[in-house]
Amino acid sequence: MKIIDWNQLDTAAQAQTLTRPAQTIATQTREAVAALIEQVRRGGDTALRDITARLDGVDLATFEVTAAELAAAATAVAPELQHAMQTAAARIEAFHRAGMTNGYRVETAPGVVCERLVRPIARVGLYVPAGSAPLFSTALMLGVPARLAGCREVVLCTPPSKDGRANPAVLLAARLTGVTRVFTLGGAQAIAAMAYGTASVPTCDKVFGPGNSFVTEAKQQLAQAGVVAIDMPAGPSEVLVIADAAANPAFIAADLLSQAEHGPDSQVLLLSDSDALMTAVQTALALQLQQLSRAEIARQALAQSRLIKVATLETAFDISNRYAPEHLILALRQPRAWLHRVAAAGSVFLGDYTPEALGDYCSGTNHVLPTGGAARAYSGVSVSSFQNMISVQAASRSGIAEIGDCALTLARAEGLDAHANAVALRMGTVP
């Protein structure tokens, strides 16, 4: 990673510096996903068996994990990992429970009462990937808020291993969080199955979870077609670090690499006003890379990442808000004093001893976050992601007499005579 001096760049070069790795979906991928979706829509379970055999190399008679298999999963997971998962789930629940939205009721005028009701989405689908490694942590991050929201049915799909079984840790996470049904299905076909429903897989109202380019494309296509709602735009993982001269370069290098190892299309950025720190981070990166099992993946990600020298930390925050990172680390001496400058980020990590990896696993916050700049308008998954907000209003005879003239004036100004008539008829019955 080379050091770039922000002040030496013109406007076009600055924009180019903040450009993320090209995320254009190849026409071939888009067409392949569309074909898979259509195959599942038309063929249901039969199509799912054919696709699973072709893409996963597994012949499955049934997709659903039995209650006995779920119960047995705990015996296949090491006690230390079980304890860690239980601890993480408890912290995730504590954080998400504290932020739950309550309904409210307010009288907006004499005789006019407006309310907001909070209702769970009836049936939700969770996707837990298992590419280079089964992400049982994602099952915790999605399953806990779904349970707190009160969803009647929570469906989870995760790819089968070569023996046709789901990963035991994923099954344990599903059991810990109260997931109601689990299916060994992966890829775009799993998303299509939850969106359209099959004889085995129930139709879901909303689908959550990360995945590869096929999963992401399937979610986008099905959402754009109005078939199913999705959690948020998805994309490769990213982190932006703002650091001062006193930050620990080894810590920063470790945080950058923890994101870079996700995939070659991940992006990491370091912004600092200290040349010495950035040089030290370069050295630390080279040393730590030698010890990583996924070093080659991390190197590819670092090749399209940036070390950006800024004149002031204020400028660093302006750049960060423009970039809107998924993860933002403030490696500063008084990080909380700078928090008011953060306007767009998925999740923020304060100080030298809050690595992003804590948020990935067990601090309690959710790691399913907006990427690709979507943090300017989207938030990470929360309990409210699994709920609907329903508005209610009730006007008495005196209430419509109180506000009816306002409605008549507005309706007539918009030329909507039927709207005006619906109010006027009622006002005519008020003594």
UniProtKB/Swiss-Prot annotation:
<dbReference type="Pfam" id="PF00815">
    <property type="entry name" value="Histidinol_dh"/>
</dbReference>
<feature type="binding site">
    <location>
        <position position="360"/>
    </location>
    <ligand>
        <name>Zn(2+)</name>
    </ligand>
</feature>
<feature type="binding site">
    <location>
        <position position="327"/>
    </location>
    <ligand>
        <name>substrate</name>
    </ligand>
</feature>
<dbReference type="InterPro" id="IPR001692">
    <property type="entry name" value="Histidinol_DH_CS"/>
</dbReference>
<feature type="binding site">
    <location>
        <position position="189"/>
    </location>
    <ligand>
        <name>NAD(+)</name>
    </ligand>
</feature>
<dbReference type="InterPro" id="IPR022695">
    <property type="entry name" value="Histidinol_DH_monofunct"/>
</dbReference>
<dbReference type="GO" id="GO:0004399">
    <property type="term" value="F:histidinol dehydrogenase activity"/>
</dbReference>
<feature type="binding site">
    <location>
        <position position="237"/>
    </location>
    <ligand>
        <name>substrate</name>
    </ligand>
</feature>
<dbReference type="GO" id="GO:0051287">
    <property type="term" value="F:NAD binding"/>
</dbReference>
<feature type="binding site">
    <location>
        <position position="212"/>
    </location>
    <ligand>
        <name>NAD(+)</name>
    </ligand>
</feature>
<feature type="active site" description="Proton acceptor">
    <location>
        <position position="326"/>
    </location>
</feature>
<keyword id="KW-0368">Histidine biosynthesis</keyword>
<feature type="binding site">
    <location>
        <position position="360"/>
    </location>
    <ligand>
        <name>substrate</name>
    </ligand>
</feature>
<feature type="binding site">
    <location>
        <position position="262"/>
    </location>
    <ligand>
        <name>substrate</name>
    </ligand>
</feature>
<comment type="similarity">
    <text>Belongs to the histidinol dehydrogenase family.</text>
</comment>
<feature type="binding site">
    <location>
        <position position="259"/>
    </location>
    <ligand>
        <name>substrate</name>
    </ligand>
</feature>
<feature type="binding site">
    <location>
        <position position="419"/>
    </location>
    <ligand>
        <name>substrate</name>
    </ligand>
</feature>
<feature type="binding site">
    <location>
        <position position="414"/>
    </location>
    <ligand>
        <name>substrate</name>
    </ligand>
</feature>
<keyword id="KW-0520">NAD</keyword>
<feature type="binding site">
    <location>
        <position position="127"/>
    </location>
    <ligand>
        <name>NAD(+)</name>
    </ligand>
</feature>
<protein>
    <recommendedName>
        <fullName>Histidinol dehydrogenase</fullName>
        <ecNumber>1.1.1.23</ecNumber>
    </recommendedName>
</protein>
<feature type="binding site">
    <location>
        <position position="419"/>
    </location>
    <ligand>
        <name>Zn(2+)</name>
    </ligand>
</feature>
<keyword id="KW-0479">Metal-binding</keyword>
<dbReference type="InterPro" id="IPR012131">
    <property type="entry name" value="Hstdl_DH"/>
</dbReference>
<dbReference type="GO" id="GO:0005829">
    <property type="term" value="C:cytosol"/>
</dbReference>
<keyword id="KW-0560">Oxidoreductase</keyword>
<feature type="active site" description="Proton acceptor">
    <location>
        <position position="327"/>
    </location>
</feature>
<dbReference type="InterPro" id="IPR016161">
    <property type="entry name" value="Ald_DH/histidinol_DH"/>
</dbReference>
<dbReference type="GO" id="GO:0008270">
    <property type="term" value="F:zinc ion binding"/>
</dbReference>
<keyword id="KW-0028">Amino-acid biosynthesis</keyword>
<comment type="pathway">
    <text>Amino-acid biosynthesis; L-histidine biosynthesis; L-histidine from 5-phospho-alpha-D-ribose 1-diphosphate: step 9/9.</text>
</comment>
<feature type="binding site">
    <location>
        <position position="259"/>
    </location>
    <ligand>
        <name>Zn(2+)</name>
    </ligand>
</feature>
<dbReference type="GO" id="GO:0000105">
    <property type="term" value="P:L-histidine biosynthetic process"/>
</dbReference>
<comment type="function">
    <text>Catalyzes the sequential NAD-dependent oxidations of L-histidinol to L-histidinaldehyde and then to L-histidine.</text>
</comment>
<feature type="binding site">
    <location>
        <position position="262"/>
    </location>
    <ligand>
        <name>Zn(2+)</name>
    </ligand>
</feature>
<keyword id="KW-0862">Zinc</keyword>
